Swiss-Prot record:
Annotated gene: tmk
Lineage: Bacteria, Pseudomonadati, Pseudomonadota, Gammaproteobacteria, Enterobacterales
Keyword Ion transport part of the UniProt annotation: no
CDD domains per UniProt: TMPK
Protein name: Thymidylate kinase
Binding site for ATP: 10-17
InterPro entries: P-loop_NTPase, Thymidylate_kin-like_dom, Thymidylate_kin_CS, Thymidylate_kinase
Length: 212
């Protein structure tokens, strides 16, 4: 079976990491054994170093400008693309990504309000035509997101943003999903089993049993 690139998107607490692993196990049942899962930001030594800066800031609590944040995210993404994702796809692997470029459009574009032209220029340069075959957007409200992540020992810089920030992020996600046929919106307020089954049905239709 040819390689595929599938990404999972949404607010923190939506269940992205769990669903990423469930999708991998489901594909295994259909004979797809060459699977690589990734997460952003991170996934290479350089990307993981940048992840710490992005999520927790630099030494001495130096403030991080929103453009600096954006550039670090794209630097981490470029390392992941060139050193992990592209090599895996070239070998015929299916890559399942916990976040990709859509996160930047939603968080830095929608949440931070960064100019869309700058975002598009960076996206085009860094991803260089690499685009997911299919994206699942796990939709939950900011209120539910916050309630789900509050148990974490330490919230990162972005997780500590006010509710209005996540309202903008969610609105941007929903707008982008409405404009692109390969972004499937999933109601992630459902139980984990219901969310999983909904995603499995879409995987069947798109890739596994398209003839039925």
């Amino acid at each position: 079976m040819d390689n595929r690139f599938i990404t999972i998107e949404g607010l923190d607490g939506a269940g992205k990491t769990t669903i990423t692993h469930r999708v991998s196990k489901y594909l295994n049942q259909y004979g797809v054994t060459d699977i690589l899962t990734t997460h952003e930001p991170g996934g290479t030594p350089v990307s993981d170093f940048l992840r710490v800066l992005i999520k927790y800031g630099g030494p001495m609590n130096e403030p991080i400008n929103s453009i600096s944040e954006l550039l670090m995210i794209y630097a981490a993404r470029l390392q992941l693309i060139e050193n992990v994702i592209k090599p895996a796809l070239s070998k015929g692997y299916w890559v399942i990504g916990d976040r990709f470029d859509l996160s930047s459009q939603a968080y830095q574009g929608g949440g931070r309000g960064i100019d869309i032209l700058l975002l598009h220029a960076l996206s085009n340069k860094i991803t260089n035509t690499l685009s997911p075959d299919l994206t699942f957007y796990l939709d939950i409200s900011p209120e539910l997101s916050i309630s789900r992540i509050n148990h974490r020992q330490k919230l990162d810089r972005i997780e500590q943003e006010p509710l209005s920030f996540f309202d903008r992020v969610r609105s941007c996600y929903k707008k982008l999903a409405s404009e692109r046929k390969n972004i499937i919106t999933i109601d992630a307020t459902q139980s984990l089993e219901e969310v999983s089954m909904s995603i499995y049905r879409h995987l069947d239709w798109w890739f596994l049993r398209p003839q039925e």
